[in-house]
Design a protein with these regions (language model features):
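Juxtamembrane regions of bacterial inner-membrane/periplasmic proteins
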Residues: 2-15, 20-267
Length: 267
């Protein structure tokens, strides 16, 4: 219970022989009643609001993570109708009022040329079948190159790229990297290597409005994905790091490197 407010007054000195008794006089009572009552300052509301905001943000992030994890489970059987990258490109075209046509067709992995599968693995993630979502050797080498100021390689695996394409788009931030890192093991555990490769090849951006192996092969070479040969597969794989700036016919040097990697890997 709150304590009653105390009322203080000045001391009344009573000398011997005076007629005044040792009691409060009427004037002192009036003075005390008319004195302003001082209340203690109220604690800042910031101290109460801030923890609630932090808890609310944390709960929202956890909820979004759970939704993404459930979507990964569903992708074990359901082909993705779209991705964050697809929606991002649609939004950018709408904002800038530029024409946009999406080419996207999901096909089974069995209908994608083995040469194209091997070329993409050789170009993007040579240890795809050895790691569990993170290529620590490539991460270490990339970090070393960062320290030396000569970064020439990326360290993202196919699984990491798939998670980014599905849920986060092309933006970069520490928050996105952290969320991506927690979802990669889920994707590896739930989907498995074959399904990860299948979804990646079918949703990855291969040019302006071009998504997936089938659309890329028909857009650049006029042939279905099942009929692509080694050389054209290497050229298609060569544009993946920068699909909006590169063209297959200009990637002879890099595609030759990819072909050598394929031979070294036994393909």
């Amino acid at each position: 219970m709150p304590q009653p407010t105390r009322v203080y007054r000045a001391r009344k000195i009573v000398h011997p022989g005076t007629e005044e008794r040792a009691r409060l006089s009427f004037s002192y009572v009036t003075e005390a009643l008319n004195a302003p009552i001082q209340t203690p300052p109220r604690p800042s509301s910031f101290r109460f609001v801030m923890p609630r905001i932090v808890i609310g943000v944390f709960l929202v992030l956890i909820s979004l993570w759970l939704i993404a994890a459930l979507m990964l489970i569903g992708l074990r059987w359901i082909d993705p109708p779209t991705t964050a990258v697809h929606m991002q490109r649609h939004l950018q075209a709408w904002i800038h009022s530029t024409p946009y046509r999406e080419r996207y067709k999901f096909i089974p992995l069995s209908q994608i040329s083995p040469d194209l599968q091997h070329a993409v693995i050789a170009a993007e993630d040579a240890r795809f079948y050895q790691h569990h979502g993170f290529d620590w050797h490539e991460i270490q080498m990339a970090a070393q190159e960062d320290l030396e100021g000569a970064r020439t390689r990326g360290a993202s695996t196919i699984t990491q790229q798939l998670v980014k394409n599905l849920f986060f788009g092309t933006g970069r931030s520490f928050l996105r990297k952290g969320a991506e890192a927690t979802l990669v093991p889920v994707a590896e555990f739930v989907l498995g290597k074959r399904r990860i490769l299948e979804i990646y090849l079918d949703v990855v951006e291969w040019g302006p409005g071009v998504y997936g192996a089938e659309s890329a092969c028909r857009y650049y070479d006029g042939t279905p994905a099942r009929n692509v040969g080694r050389e054209q597969a290497a050229r298609l794989a060569a544009i993946l790091p920068a699909p909006l700036r590169r063209r297959p016919e200009r990637m002879d040097s890099y595609s030759a490197i990819i072909l050598r990697r394929m031979v070294q890997m036994g393909w």
